[in-house]
Amino acid sequence: MPLSASEGLCVLVADDEAPARQRIIDLLRRDSQVGAIIEASDGLSAVEIIQNRRPDLVFLDVQMPERTGLEVIAEVGAERMPLTVFVTAYDEHAIRAFEANALD
């Protein structure tokens, strides 16, 4: 369940590459509005965390093992998905994310 405003935002960082996850986490730790940071290293773990913990914000790698970022959204359901920031180094993945209703 999302944290109350007094506890700060609960943020999920889902990326299969540990250095990429750590860079995002380091940036989030500087923000006083962020309370809890949860990590996932694959898409299946991301789905389970989203369904069970209901984070307020998700940083989601497009290309991960077990489930891609787009498959995570499809499995959770776009209407139940928290605000999501797609993380990708590939233009092709960004295009597919926008086709899945991601915002620029």
Where are these regions (language model features)?
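Basic, polyanion-interacting recognition surfaces, primarily
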Residues: M1-P2, P19
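Short, flexible hinge/linker loops that cap or flank conserved catalytic cores
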Residues: L3-S6, A78
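Conserved acidic segment of CheY-like receiver
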Residues: E7-P19, I24, L28
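Switch/coupling loops of ABC transporter nucleotide-binding domains
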Residues: L9, G35, P82
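Conserved beta-strand positions in the Rossmann-like core of class I SAM-dependent methyltransferases
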Residues: L12, I37-I38
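Acidic, metal-coordinating helix/loop segments flanking the phosphotransfer/catalytic sites
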Residues: I25, R29-D31, E39-L57
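Short helix-capping segments at alpha-helix termini
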Residues: R29-Q33, E79-R80
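CheY-like receiver
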Residues: V47-D104
